[in-house]
């Protein structure tokens, strides 16, 4: 008889190798065929809503690791919520207006100047839709479950119509105004930028100290002094109209080399060192407030420079006397306005100086620095020129420096509802908690929001102008434009004349002849995406405002979190979200930013093609995503190894349940052995821990808990000793069915617990599980932790056993290394434990040699009675010797009962009995 045929070895068709790059697309096709998104919505209908609102990625190019991290995190949450009593719809979105699409078309050779704005915009829309399609397929490949057939797209007419309504509501409340004000201006984009569209990079700039002679000392100064200013933007000096000093600072009149200079007293030493003054003496001091209204002379124009008071003046750098050009700085503008100065801005849209800067007209601003510095030197006003490298704002799209420039722009007045904004921030739940401080400070400190852009591809600002120049924004015009956009899309604005965009028969006192103009500026793209709470959450039947959660990268505090908050509070008085969660950026394995120049870019598509979407998702679950995270081949290799461990666990569980019918073979909990009940206690602990981790969005805790459970609780302990029962005993042996009962509970729970993170794998496992009826694990709920009777006492006892078992394993390892035994089944062990452990061992009814995986187990005396040469550990001394007897051909246990049964002379007594009872006819 072939005894190996009498072993109940694991049997399953569940493949050992994941082969995810091939298997996942097939699984996704299956999901599409069964309409999994709709099925889940149907299954969860009537439950409380949980809305995670998708911040729209920009529709341009392939998705990058940041996109993957973001969408997968969202998917974890939505999947978990739909398995824990919520209906969790997920509507993906795309941001589709703005400069990058215009640039992409230009790069493709589109001749912008040779077509009408409307024609160019049609090409932009086509391109945007192509990009949406491209990204949609890549997001689907990640396994993200969403309403992919009904996303929201900011260029769609219904969306644009709602955005116009948001603008109209804000205008009605008096929050929208047109004003001349310095704004961030990008000469390369020829447009104003919002704060969210700038990034800081190092730039080399001229650093100059310039003397402004006093023209009128107002009886405070004698008139022969000179104010010293410091600037790193010499090109703004043609726009200088004043000097700001701080009212509370003390200013020194310093005599040196026959000249008298005015600087802040506390900066005297620094300035003296920089300007290499020797023997400089302070001849007089005055308070800043006394210098108000003194007048200096512009260094190279026949023009006054008024001395004004400003709280923005600091002693961090410079001289305490600040060059003030109201057309080129926010503080300058505010101070200038207070003192009635004009807003002089001698720079055009392209960054070129105009005739208002005589002597420098026609020069690009950055190229004007040198001739202006030379002019200062020529007139004797330049005291020092050096070059510094400093952090300077750049256009986030063109990567080129930007300037502050006063232009006529449309603004949303943040000041008008700042108090409500700050209250809304305080009422929101922020994860991480520092998010609250970050947004609070941004809202507290930000100026009014410049919402106009001088571009073609965007939503037009729905404003008309009367013949007398009055802007027209009324309920009637707003509603009419919104209706037109809903019917025809916003291109209609560029296809029709102003009169054809106004309601029929519209009149206005400022247009006696019935003539009207329309605004040509478009809205900031942050106003587009920032209106999604109205256009999506409020408009869709399956969603609601406020959303439960917004989840984006930490750059969105100044972006989407901010713009959404501003428009929502302006229109509804409340935040559009109850909670905000942010994640960090994805860096390479060494913690460097990914860039083409370094060549360290990791692409999601490559990972999915080589390893699979579930590996990428498992990586997302493994990292501390609230900070910046790292990814590399080595890191992915480690994650793939963890995946292999989890997959093998599933395969082992399935293999050993091949002959298990839950309805027939399940053993009642009360009839399980203690060790089996202990395993159920461990399983319930896992369920509790994992669900708590999901609830708090701590996915790394989910990852570690599941990995540890598979490797430590199952593989290293329970499954290890269970093999001797599962394979060796007869099919219906009570211990075997008891273990299978536990394995079944573990398998079902584990499959559900990993579903949000590994949906492809979980749905691959699901149909192999005996007795399941649901079409997909996604249509089930998370397992519930069951409180077993006496669970705490059981846990205490068996946790103690596990620590003692560690001592035994160490002793067996030593014996193996010393060649006393070959493998643990060759061993006979005698334990000399502590009193506490001895009592615990004596209370165990299970076969301890099975639990220790040895051939013979004896309990000796107390620890102090152990032989002198016996290795002593924390809880026991252990004597390991070679077991006496022969090795059983069937179970490999060393036993003196081999051959006792003449018919089965190579088997131990136990195996002979099993064979006779189950396999001998």
UniProtKB/Swiss-Prot annotation:
Entry-linked Pfam families: Anticodon_1 (PF08264), tRNA-synt_1 (PF00133), zf-FPG_IleRS (PF06827)
GO cellular component, one term: cytosol
Intracellular or extracellular location(s): Cytoplasm
Catalytic activity: tRNA(Ile) + L-isoleucine + ATP = L-isoleucyl-tRNA(Ile) + AMP + diphosphate
InterPro entries: aa-tRNA-synth_I_CS, aa-tRNA-synth_Ia, Anticodon_Ile_BEm, Ile-tRNA-ligase, Ile-tRNA-ligase_type1, Ile-tRNA_ligase, M/V/L/I-tRNA-synth_anticd-bd, Rossmann-like_a/b/a_fold
CDD domains registered for this protein in UniProt: Anticodon_Ia_Ile_BEm, IleRS_core
A GO molecular-function descriptor: ATP binding
Residues the record lists as binding ATP: 596
This enzyme's EC code(s): 6.1.1.5
Family annotation (Gene3D superfamilies): 1.10.730.20, HUPs (3.40.50.620), Ile-tRNA synthetase CP2 domain-like (1.10.10.830), Valyl/Leucyl/Isoleucyl-tRNA synthetase, editing domain (3.90.740.10)
Binding site for L-isoleucyl-5'-AMP: 552
GO biological process, one term: isoleucyl-tRNA aminoacylation
Residue intervals passing through the bilayer: none
Cofactor note: Binds 1 zinc ion per subunit.
Keyword tRNA processing recorded: no
Cofactors that this protein relies on: Zn(2+)
Residue ranges annotated as motif 'KMSKS' region: 593-597
The entry's keywords: Aminoacyl-tRNA synthetase, ATP-binding, Cytoplasm, Ligase, Metal-binding, Nucleotide-binding, Protein biosynthesis, Zinc
Ligand binding (Zn(2+)): 888, 891, 908, 911
PROSITE patterns assigned: AA_TRNA_LIGASE_I
Function: Catalyzes the attachment of isoleucine to tRNA(Ile). As IleRS can inadvertently accommodate and process structurally similar amino acids such as valine, to avoid such errors it has two additional distinct tRNA(Ile)-dependent editing activities. One activity is designated as 'pretransfer' editing and involves the hydrolysis of activated Val-AMP. The other activity is designated 'posttransfer' editing and involves deacylation of mischarged Val-tRNA(Ile).
Notes on the domains: IleRS has two distinct active sites: one for aminoacylation and one for editing. The misactivated valine is translocated from the active site to the editing site, which sterically excludes the correctly activated isoleucine. The single editing site contains two valyl binding pockets, one specific for each substrate (Val-AMP or Val-tRNA(Ile)).
NCBIfam families, per database record: ileS
Assembly notes: Monomer.
Protein name per UniProt: Isoleucine--tRNA ligase
Top-level taxonomy: Bacteria, Bacillati, Bacillota, Bacilli, Bacillales
